[in-house]
Curated annotation (Swiss-Prot):
GO terms for molecular function: naringenin-chalcone synthase activity. This is Chalcone synthase LF4. The gene is CHS-LF4. InterPro entries: Chalcone/stilbene_synt_C, Chalcone/stilbene_synt_N, Chalcone/stilbene_synthase_AS, Polyketide_synthase_type-III, Thiolase-like. The primary product of this enzyme is 4,2',4',6'-tetrahydroxychalcone (also termed naringenin-chalcone or chalcone) which can under specific conditions spontaneously isomerize into naringenin. The active site is at 164. It comes from Ipomoea batatas (Sweet potato). It comes from the Eukaryota. It is an enzyme of class 2 (transferase). Disulfide bonds: none annotated. Its EC number is 2.3.1.74.
Length: 393
């Protein structure tokens, strides 16, 4: 007779969950941040609000963003004038776009990750799909499974309305799934489009305007599994994962799904809340490893905005190069909510390889990935890099 303990042991993987492939994609429509205020105030019929436009121009100039990608083209916005008002009922039209385009963009990212992984998609055992862009039943996880032609027995998990911390959440969940199910291969997809949040300017709600200056569209996919086979190419190991609510931060970041779409609210002191709580999260994550020098690890932080990065850098005494990959993704894509940290992982491993560094983590062994979002919620993932094998010359 087999015991429960023996069954459990047989079910578990031997080694830690490992990232085996990463794929990223954006919509084709690219918007230049320097000219975006002119476009935004024209398309929303708000050019008469000259003072507000000047304010928005300053927000865009200070955003450290060069360009963003958006599914919403001028043509789509002209077909849906309600999107361009500040508070016009428009949820049906927004949903009609989101329920189709979110899984479609996610599929492109997933195909890219599967191609890099190099294994048959029939080996995917679990799907975790994450989006803050629209809700539906059956969800985007179901649509993705159909679009990719995955097995009907694939185990799906759908995460809606988590916000900007969720890139850390999906890695935490994938870690648990991979390590507790021997042979599991988990496909994570974060797909975000601003169709639910885009709206015209308001003189009384400047936090909404901040969102219009920062958010962009993108999808990222990651394949996670433990005990890689010789045919698989490990990129990062997921060593530990934690989630914390910052004390006294209620209302710091809120989003509410209404007839007008997803409304976005934030307090001015979000950068302070993050920077005041980050050291405690770092200490709890790295104390077991005997690490207390935050410059000795590689960094992947959700780039909520430049002020958050500046305050974190200042509070922890980080060298400017620590947030290079993070700032690069902010500059090239804007804030893509949950997808951002996965884009940064991709950027880091590619830049590390191109620079001839010894590991996927900028030549360093240990690293941290942070997600920040509504709550205020902080996700902390400890990563272990993988040695880069020199390619053929």
């Amino acid at each position: 007779m087999v015991t429960v303990e023996e069954v459990r042991k047989a079910q578990r993987a031997e080694g830690p969950a490992t990232i085996l492939a990463i794929g990223t994609v954006t919509p084709a429509n690219c918007v230049n941040q320097s000219t975006y205020p002119d476009y935004y105030f024209r398309i929303t019929n708000s050019e008469h609000k000259t003072e507000l436009k000047e304010r928005f121009q300053r927000m865009c100039d200070k955003s450290m963003i060069t360009k963003r990608y958006m599914h919403l083209t001028e043509e789509i916005l002209k077909e849906n004038p309600s999107f361009c008002e500040y508070m016009a009922p428009s949820l049906d039209a927004r949903q009609d776009i989101a329920v189709v385009e979110v899984p479609k963009l996610g599929k492109e990212a997933a195909q890219s990750a599967i191609k890099e992984w190099g294994q048959p998609k029939s080996k995917i055992t679990h799907v975790v799909f994450c989006t803050t862009s629209g809700v539906d039943m059956p969800g985007a996880d179901y649509q993705l499974t159909k679009l990719l032609g995955l097995r009907p027995s694939v185990k799906r998990l759908m995460m809606y309305q988590q916000g900007c911390f969720a890139g850390g959440t999906v890695l935490r969940l994938a870690k648990d799934l991979a390590e507790n199910n021997k042979g599991a291969r988990v496909l994570i997809v974060c797909s975000e489009i601003t169709v639910v949040t885009f709206r015209g300017p308001s003189e009384t709600h400047l936090d909404s305007l901040v969102g219009q200056a920062l958010f962009g569209d993108g999808a990222a996919a990651v394949i996670v599994g433990a005990d890689p086979t010789p045919a698989e190419k490990p990129l990062f190991q997921l060593v530990s994962a934690a989630q914390n609510l910052a004390p006294d931060s209620c209302g710091a970041i809120d989003g509410h799904l209404r007839e007008v779409g997803l409304t976005f609210h934030l307090l001015k002191d979000v950068p302070s809340v993050v920077s005041n709580n980050i050291e405690k999260c770092l200490f709890e994550a790295f104390n077991p490893l005997g690490i207390s020098d935050w410059n000795s690890v590689f960094w992947i932080a959700h780039p909520g905005g430049p002020a958050i990065l500046d305050q974190v850098e200042d509070k922890l005494g980080l060298k400017p190069e620590k947030l290079r990959a993070t700032r690069h993704v902010l500059s090239e894509y804007g804030n893509m909510s949950s997808a951002c940290v996965l884009f940064i992982l991709d950027e880091m491993r590619k830049a590390s390889s191109n620079a001839g560094l010894g590991t996927t983590g900028e030549g360093l062994e240990w690293g941290v990935l942070f997600g920040f979002g509504p709550g205020l919620t902080i996700e902390t993932v400890v990563l272990h890099s993988v040695p880069i094998k020199p390619g053929p010359h």
